[in-house]
Amino acid sequence: MNKFIVVGAGHAGLEAAFILSKLNNKVYLCVLDRKYVANCPCNPSVGGPAKGIVTREIDALGGIQALAADSTALQRKILNSSKGPGVQCLRFQIDKVYYKKWFLEQIDNNENIELVEGEVTEVIKNGDTATGVMIDGVKKLEAGAVIITTGTYLKSLTFSGKDVKNEGPEGFKNSNNLSEWFKVNGFELIRLKTGTPPRIKKDSIDYSNLQIEPGNGTELYFSHWSKNKYIDYELPCYLIHTTEEIHKIINDNLHLSAMYSGNITGVGPRYCPSIEDKIVRFSNKPRHQIFLEPESLELDTVYLGGFSTSLDISVQDKIIRLLPGLKKAEVIKYGYAIEYDAINPIQLYPSLESKLIKNLFFAGQINGTSGYEEAAGQGLIAGINANQKIKNKEPLILSRDEAYIGVMIDDIVNKGVTDPYRLLTSRAEYRLLLRNDNVLDRLIQKGYEIGTISKEQIDLYNQNLEKKNKLIEFLKDKKVGMYTLLKAHTNNTNFSLYEFLKRPEIKLIELLKLIEFDYSNYDLELLKNIEITVKYEGYIKKESRIVNSLKNLESIKIPKDLIYDKVQNLSIEAIDKLNKIKPLNLAQAQRISGINLADIISLKTHLEQNA
């Protein structure tokens, strides 16, 4: 049994550990303290635009986040249901206390995972290969590969106004030694910042005039494989807005924000700004949305989504109590910003292995990303590829047309990050191919080939695929008169049901009911997938043609030891960027910032001449 070390037990570390254990490996899961496992220091939710699709992609490859979210959901929502299928997704409020308990139970019941408490102070090397770690500077752990998933704990500082603390999220202990080790061993570190909102005592809020934000019912699931539920009902969220009075107080007290006083040197997230950042950057907006979200059935706290802040607590007290329904609010925990070290991810291969040290992988916020889902997606890929590396197998590298996980990793390893990277649907060129409903079509076969998807799972998928294909053939063959379908005074021209379903106002279930077709052995998700496949056939084929036209560049591999200075007519900037990033193929090289078409032509010519 091969041995692996995972450093950090957050969303990335857990995904890496469980996928490695599923592949029959021994995993040492290192964490500062057992209570840090599966911590959710920011929003108590999983999913959202693009991110929710990542959670389903993880599930299709055999990962665990979808099961955890389904098993701990307090509210389930479909987002963007009125928009096109390329942007529809799931978002669940989760119980952050039970989410942690759920993962600890999974760890305790898994013979292949051993939880090791203590601070990892350095990575042990043999030449240029990682072989283990030191715990607390004294205990040596050895393994075939090491995966770093330290989140926001490296040299972290928290800020509320002028108050600065040498600590990790939620007052937890941070980790300082590993940052120094990375620096000494040639890694380029960057300083990033994120933040979290205040938590309010649930019973101190007046809900009487607040706009309720209900869920969409308890029969929604991230996972394709199980129908786990935490509760058979849903807790509501509430929507409120900031006021101009609040904006004025924030503007008048920007000098008391750690972000604007100069205390923080790290770069904050562009797409998840603090409330003071929103007021400054979007000064023309008279109000901003704030969501009141429950954190747990076991906690008396409500999360103020959209109200992240590093303002002094005296200012926080004022502006919180000016929010609708919060006049008598009791603050359980004040908002704060956190600054931390990360590595520049251009130092990684698309497999998430380090270019500097073999068998050393990185995943999650250490790579400059933000979000639980982004972290989990990287953890899964790092775990799979650490396994592949030790077993001398090809790494799993998902392309931009196969998965949002592929889009994210391609972005960060080719372009690096300057602020915490967040996945957005707009980052994907092929959104219609990367839908919420077709995740299994895209990825399950890869999971099965690697060994993370079981024979039972692939058989179930193939049964559904056969049912899908049969129904599509039936729709193509079945001709029905227009009068029968519309009951309108028109000529009774015969149309296939397939053609008729392409009309935007026609729903598949309504059509099947009309012709009295028994669809009871089709689940609703499969019917939705069939409907989208038919309605968007032309657009899907168009995107697929574009993808296929670019595949040629991906097939032209670039040797890792290629000396770019010897490639004729390459620009100096191109040589510098290519030496830094070391792309694996021409398609990856083309996506690097600063590489132009002339550089690609020169590189292609050189590779062909030296094939």
From Swiss-Prot:
SMART domains: GIDA_assoc_3 (SM01228)
UniProt keywords, alphabetically: Cytoplasm, FAD, Flavoprotein, NAD, tRNA processing
Chief localisation class: cytoplasm
Obligatory cofactor(s): FAD
GO cellular component: cytosol
UniProt cross-references to InterPro entries, sorted A to Z: FAD/NAD-bd_sf, GIDA_C_N, MnmG, MnmG-rel, MnmG-rel_CS, MnmG_C, MnmG_C_subdom, MnmG_C_subdom_sf
GO biological process terms held by the UniProt record: tRNA methylation; tRNA wobble uridine modification
One term of GO molecular function: flavin adenine dinucleotide binding
Binding site for NAD(+): 268-282
Record flagged with keyword Iron-sulfur: no
Disulfide bond found in the keyword field: no
Location in or out of the cell: Cytoplasm
Pfam families reported in the protein's UniProt record: GIDA, GIDA_C_1st, SAM_GIDA_C
SUPFAM superfamilies noted in UniProt: FAD/NAD(P)-binding domain
Residues noted as binding FAD in the record, renumbered to the chain: 8-13, 120, 175, 365
Role: NAD-binding protein involved in the addition of a carboxymethylaminomethyl (cmnm) group at the wobble position (U34) of certain tRNAs, forming tRNA-cmnm(5)s(2)U34.
Family: Belongs to the MnmG family.
Description of how the protein assembles with itself and partners: Homodimer. Heterotetramer of two MnmE and two MnmG subunits.
PANTHER family for this protein: GLUCOSE INHIBITED DIVISION PROTEIN A, PROTEIN MTO1 HOMOLOG, MITOCHONDRIAL
Protein's name according to its UniProt entry: tRNA uridine 5-carboxymethylaminomethyl modification enzyme MnmG
Gene from which this protein is expressed: mnmG
